[in-house]
Amino acid sequence: MLATTHLALINVFTGDIQGGLGPFLGTWLAQTGGWSPARVGFVTTLVGVGALFLSGPAGALVDRIGRPRLLIAAACVAILAGTLLILPAKSFPAVFAAQMVAAAGGVLLLPAITELTLGIVGKDRFPKQQGRNQAYNHLGILIAAGLISFGTAYFGAAVAFWVLGAMAVLAIVATLTTPGHCYNGRRAVGWKEDDPDDKPERATTRSVLSNRKLMVLAVALALFNLGNGGMLTLLGQKLVAAGSDATAWTARYVMVAQLVMIPVALFAGSLADKRGRRKLLLVALAVLPVRAALSAFIDDPLWLISAEILDGVASGIVGVAVPVVVADLTWGSGRTQTALGTVNAVQGIGGALSAWYGGLAQSVLGWSGSFLALGAPALIALALVIWLDTTSEPGRRTQRRERLAASWKPA
């Protein structure tokens, strides 16, 4: 079996488990422990904040150890253990501790899988492979959601644990059976593969994180997530206020967005080389205000599907482009995963504040105004990325034109 096939399987099986039980945690705690929505929301928020603090160190751990297969397997074990510890947990401290174990595994997965991918395919093939990784990731989320949705009717809420456990075990098997000789640690960080005696010093963490372009990118992504993160939640609340079946429609919207993300991720991986990474980011950021406007002025739940299609477009592109751009900006430093973890932490701040920001905007501006307010941060992010005219490497076509222009000499 090819190493890229193992990458596909790893991404399918880790797609759903990265966030642990996710929304099913609240359902389980409410049904078995009688937890109130406020209590569920509080523990979820605390775990989310804790995960933000772990994201940067997780990336640094991947860079330091240089054994991504081991770390992916360890992350899956942590997610599985943290999830299973929820079963006997009844008190707030026990649930929080269990979820933090799962969260630690979750934040480790992205940099570890990125490192493994770079070490297998190299940087030149990374954009296209990252597109495939994300497509399989979204496919895994869809498969898990379908199994849980259908299984709940027959086995109850506990089916979520069985599905997550099975996918975690399969992810571990897919990881540990990946041919070890296909991974090259020097290839993964941008050092010369054919000269093992050449051992460049890793850049200091401070020098990498003081990269202005990297930090501007992180701020732009935080602004994107400030608008994007809470938009579906606010849309569900709008449907409740209108008397619609918000739960059913929200589930449909999630499925639609995930379905759209699969082809978008594949196209984004290909276009990253042909058109350049920056153009992809510009498209993703420009789509969010349009989605916000549709959510603001459309009341029919069926027509609101159009807004969630745009969610799939924007999120699908961001999932592919961000690791690729971070690799561009840090290549050869030996700190790519440290940078990726830090960028994820910064953009996660925007996502954590999004629901609060949307709710505050709704109380002041009403439904239409609140969605427009959620779209506004993306416009600022758009301006930042436009300013970063050399954020990442140009597309292959641009590179080819530049080489031709450089080689042409007038008579």
Question: What is each model feature region?
Answer:
Residues 1, 180-217, 402-411:
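Juxtamembrane intracellular "pre-TM" segments in multi-pass secondary transporters
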Residues 1-48, 215-216, 225-242:
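Helix-loop boundary and gating motifs at the non-cytosolic
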Residues 29-30, 61-63, 150-155, 239-240, ...:
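Interfacial helix-cap and linker-helix signal at transmembrane-aqueous boundaries
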Residues 42-59, 255-267:
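Central cavity-lining transmembrane alpha-helices of secondary-active solute carriers
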Residues 54-67, 264-276, 362:
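Helix-to-loop junctions at the C-terminal end of transmembrane segments
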Residues 70-84, 279-294:
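Structural signature of the two symmetry-related core transmembrane helices
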Residues 100-137, 324-325:
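Cytoplasmic helix-loop-helix junction between adjacent transmembrane helices
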Residues 160-177, 371-386:
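Symmetry-related core transmembrane helices of the 12-TM Major Facilitator Superfamily/SLC fold
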